[in-house]
Regions:
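Extracytoplasmic ligand-binding site segments that recognize negatively charged/polar headgroups
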Residues: 148
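N-terminal organellar transit peptides
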Residues: 1-118, 122-127, 137-141, 152-306
Length: 306
């Protein structure tokens, strides 16, 4: 190799090393100063919570289009780790759902180091409102349906159908309440009292979360938390949201909290499944019978109900 060729090769390697070091430095600065973003790519991440809020099942959460706790939390973590993201917009269009899944998402939202603004679209009720109490600010469309602060548990009663079909269920149990919630028989007064106690406990937690997140007196929240829904306008008057507006207004609010000037760029956050994860999700997807059995189990929900 000639001397000129060697010099050219060394120069090329030096340039490549310099580019890598500059990239690493930019990433480090973006991570350390999330409000500054990365270069010109200062963006507001959009994390969507659409449909019923549910607990993830196996690997199927990667294939789900609904608001499973693991998918939403994964999207939040992705936004937190992205150096081009300065703030997060939590887009909520959900009637709520699982008590546990709602609480998991709420904790993830509250724990975000980057500012989070929640935006209420058509409906952000019950669990949809619960998760938003972890955000720094809530922007609601004037005609959104929100509120529905409360807990519900529904048990399918199939005794009449089983009787018509001539099906009987024989149960051997260790205690009188072991089969509480069985669709083959109604609840006893004692079992109803037990279930009511669980509902009341989850309800008190809901009230505490709203009081803390919205900086409202607990007594005031209790007066609002009878399960009714509120429009965005009513919610603003009651202190349940911070402002009325569109999604664009919410993006501007998120950018403002991050110190961004002008209209921020947005970036959709959605965890993508690998080919292996898609295959595993298809294999482990619950069959219809198992899915029906899960619906028959007693459960507590922060959910808008008719």
């Amino acid at each position: 190799m000639s001397r000129n060729a060697k010099v050219g090769l060394v120069a090329l390697v030096a340039v490549l090393i310099g580019i890598v070091l500059l990239g690493c430095a930019a990433t480090a600065v973006g991570a350390a100063l999330p409000g500054l973003g990365a270069g010109l790519g200062r963006k507001v991440a959009i994390v969507r919570v659409e449909g019923p809020i549910s607990l993830a099942s196996g690997n199927t959460w990667l294939l789900s289009t609904s608001a499973t706790d693991r998918r939403v939390i994964a999207d939040l973590h992705k936004a937190e780790a992205d150096p081009s993201v300065a703030a997060i917009l939590l887009y909520v269009n959900s009637p709520g759902g699982s008590v546990v899944a709602s609480d998991e998402i709420y904790r993830a939202v509250k724990g975000c180091k980057k500012p989070v603004v929640a935006y209420f679209a058509e409906v952000a009720a019950s669990g949809g409102y619960y998760i938003s109490c972890g955000a720094k600010r809530i922007v609601a469309h004037p005609d959104t349906m929100t509120g529905s602060i409360g807990v519900i548990s529904e048990i399918v009663m199939a005794k009449g159908l089983l009787d018509k079909l001539g099906v009987t269920v024989e149960t051997v149990k260790s205690g009188p309440a072991k089969d509480m919630g069985s669709p083959a028989r109604p609840l006893t007064p004692e079992e109803r009292e037990i279930l009511q106690g669980l509902i009341d406990e989850a309800y008190q937690n809901f009230v505490d979360v709203v009081a803390a997140g919205r900086n409202l007196p607990r007594e005031q929240v209790l007066r609002l938390a009878d399960g009714r829904v509120y429009s965005g306008r009513q919610a603003l008057e009651l202190g349940l949201v911070d402002q009325l507006g569109s999604m664009d207004d919410a993006v501007m609010a998120a950018g403002g909290l991050a110190g961004l000037k002008g209209v921020p760029q947005t970036k959709e956050m959605r965890s993508q499944a690998s080919l292996m994860e898609v295959l595993l999700g298809a294999i482990t997807k619950p069959d219809p019978v198992s899915a029906l059995q899960q619906r028959l189990y007693p459960s507590l929900e922060y959910r808008l109900a008719p």
